[in-house]
Amino acid sequence: MNRVVYVQPDFPVDAFAGTATYYARYRVPYPAGLLKDLITRAGLTGAGRLLDLACGPGRVALALASSFQEIWAIDLEPEMIVVGQHEATQRGVHNITWMVGKAEELAAPPASFVLITIGEAFHRLDQQRVAQHTLQWLQPGGCLAILGGYGPWSGTEPWQRLVAAIVRHWTSHHAAHGAVAAQPQPGSGPDHNERVLRATGFVEVASYPFVVPHDWTIDTLIGNLYSTSFCSKRVLGDNAAAFEAELKAALLAHDPSGTYSEQMRFGYTIGRKPS
């Protein structure tokens, strides 16, 4: 059945408060092969304008900065924008306009972007509204790309199941604030995203997976978890130290090497505005 069930987001406005520095440092970058593939499929030439919706600290905007004359990057969390601006300055990137606000409420002129990206955020947005807006904002032949990746708690390695169980325990029973559930969620994933794009009027809709090897340490795992809305230091509150201690002890008991390997799954769904 191909009926589209649009997500009506219920994430708190401050769901990512306090996560921006962890996000910039500990989220694994999108694979170079994925970005190169996106550039090729979108037909980017180094000209035109990119819009990065729900941009976080600018992981997509910064990675694609050299492929555009101008970039708009918008996120609801002010700390994300501050960290993104700092990262841009450190990298010598000066073609990004940073904005604080909701993707759903952005006022953008029609037919003004050659590519619009949404990285690991489409499940948190009003999908029907955002998809319709992006179709209006794109130039004819321009593309919308929804990028995503799976966190270290979502894989099938034994150590990942261990991490998931500990995270679930602490965020279900000990959280200082209401924890936001981890993916997968209704209204997320490539198949769903494809249905949304087709229903909106995009053509040439397809999804492309990328798998890359990655080695975690205990510190980078904890930093990555602190970059999430459901296991941030703010969510854990005074229990953060106890959470860290239990996670470290469990991982070292499982594998005392302190290195934990996985095949990380990334991907993107792309659709083109009819010419």
Language-model segments: residues:
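Conserved Class I S-adenosyl-L-methionine
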Residues: P57, P184-S275
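Conserved catalytic/acceptor-binding region of the Class I
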Residues: L135-V212
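A short beta-strand submotif of the Rossmann-like class I SAM-dependent methyltransferase core
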Residues: L115-I118, Q127
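A short acidic, Gly/Pro-enriched loop at the edge of an enzyme's catalytic core
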Residues: L106-L115
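A short, conserved alpha-helix within the catalytic core of class I
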Residues: L125-T134
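Class I SAM-dependent methyltransferase SAM/SAH-binding core
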Residues: R49-L51, P57-E105
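Conserved class I S-adenosyl-L-methionine
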Residues: N2-T45
